[in-house]
A protein has these predicted regions:
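Bacterial N-terminal signal peptides
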Residues: 4-13
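Active-site/substrate-binding loop(s) of hydrolase catalytic cores
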Residues: 1
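Non-ligating segments of multi-cofactor redox enzymes
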Residues: 16-268, 272-275, 280-399
Length: 399
């Protein structure tokens, strides 16, 4: 039996290595034309992926030292610019820690998918660095933050209530990204990344890397340009209000071993930093503010605690109702919808998505059953996403 298997493998390898025979005779040209040889780019060396992980680890270490010990904004700018060149222009924004959330989620929910070790490294290294030294990944190593910092030439101060409210979007985004990744429907963080398409406009990548083609749509290029235009006046809008990985790091940073602080023995109490920080990261001390009325505070807290279950229930119902529309992001559901429309005669002709199903020669009922199961999964996932949204809104109101 072993010899049979080995023989089959050898035959397959020899067949793959042999030159393919032409199906039709080639024409004979009298003009001296020579048929070009078909060239296939070599796959990227896997060891280079570990070079990316090493660069990430070194960048996190250097950025942490510069932020906590050297306290040098100028050198942090240099690290940030190098990260922009390497992870942004050279690697085309892929692989990135932000999108790795989806790979890890899919790996946990789909036993047939194995998360590459490199992706796990990109996912874990910034998390560990945040628990130790704060959000140094966001400060200096993330290419998405770097490109926004490069255009923030005239930042204005965003009102705290608006900044606080828009911060909800990132938590809702990470919840939606987890749902779509867990169901195998889409990696929405990667599909709707506003900067990857811009990164890949400049082909600095190696031969045979992801930089050989421009995959970004014109729509995402326009979105990226719009975000950068906003970033001229609002520092890092994507990082502050949309980035899903940043939302995770924001929570973890509350438990960091060390934080960047204003050194008390060097501070002269000028309080200029409170208004000069373009990101609104410095919270003003409230020593000069009058003490709040405890009775009013308790009453407000009681009302909010009663409101939280209402928000959870409303979010759950809304998410459950949105399950079927969200399920259309899944290829199988879209395929089943198209085949059903063709079956009842509501559309004429076929499309590629339905032709792909017909080529499998599977029964239509099997496709419909599979699609209904996916819709049911999205209803459950939508309910959980809605509860998560209600919880986030409730916690924001209490905070």
């Amino acid at each position: 039996m072993v010899l049979i298997v080995l023989g089959a493998v050898m035959v397959g390898l020899l067949a793959a290595a042999a030159p393919a025979a032409e199906r039709f005779a080639l024409p004979e040209f009298k003009s001296g034309y020579e048929r070009p040889t078909t060239e296939v780019p070599e796959p990227r060396d896997y060891t280079l992926d570990w070079v990316d992980v090493t660069v990430l680890a070194v960048g996190l270490g250097v950025a942490s030292y510069l932020a906590l010990s050297a306290r040098s904004r100028r050198w942090i700018w240099l690290v940030m610019f190098m990260a922009f060149i390497y992870f942004g222009l050279w690697r085309g924004g892929c692989i990135c820690a932000i999108g790795s959330v989806q790979n890890v989620t899919l790996g946990l929910c789909d036993a047939s998918y194995a998360v590459p070790l490199v992706v796990i490294g990109f996912f874990l290294l910034p998390l560990v660095a945040t628990l130790l030294f704060g959000r140094t990944f966001c400060a200096a190593v993330c290419p998405l933050g770097a490109i926004q910092d490069l255009v923030a030439v005239r930042p204005v101060k965003v009102p705290r209530w608006l900044d606080h409210g828009l911060g909800l979007l990132a938590y809702l985004y990470v919840g939606a990204a987890v749902l779509f990744a867990a169901t195998g429907a889409a990696f929405i963080i990667c599909e709707y990344d506003p900067f990857v398409a811009l990164f890949r406009l400049i082909p600095l990548g190696r031969h045979g890397s992801t930089m050989d083609a421009f995959p970004g749509s014109l729509t995402m290029v326009a979105v990226g340009v719009a975000v950068l235009a906003l970033g001229i006046f609002v520092a890092r809008p994507y990082c502050r209000w949309v980035c899903p990985y940043g939302a995770v790091l924001r929570v973890l940073s509350r438990f960091s071993w060390k934080h960047v602080t204003i050194t008390p023995d060097e501070c002269i109490q000028c309080r200029l930093c409170e208004d000069s920080c373009p990101f609104g990261a410095i919270q003003k001390p409230n020593a000069d503010e009058p003490s709040p009325d405890r009775v009013i505070g308790r009453r407000r807290l009681a009302i909010l605690l009663v409101l939280v279950p209402v928000l959870l229930a409303a979010g759950g119902v809304g998410g459950w109702a949105l399950g079927p529309p969200m399920a259309r992001m899944h290829y199988t559901v879209r395929q089943a919808d198209r085949v059903r429309l063709e079956e009842v005669g509501r559309v004429e002709g076929t499309e590629d998505i339905s032709d792909a199903f017909y080529d499998t020669q599977r029964p239509k009922e099997e496709l419909y059953t599979e699609a209904e199961a996916i819709v049911g999964t999205f209803r459950t996932g939508g309910l959980l996403l809605g509860v998560w949204a209600g919880l986030v809104v409730g916690m924001k109101l209490i905070h």
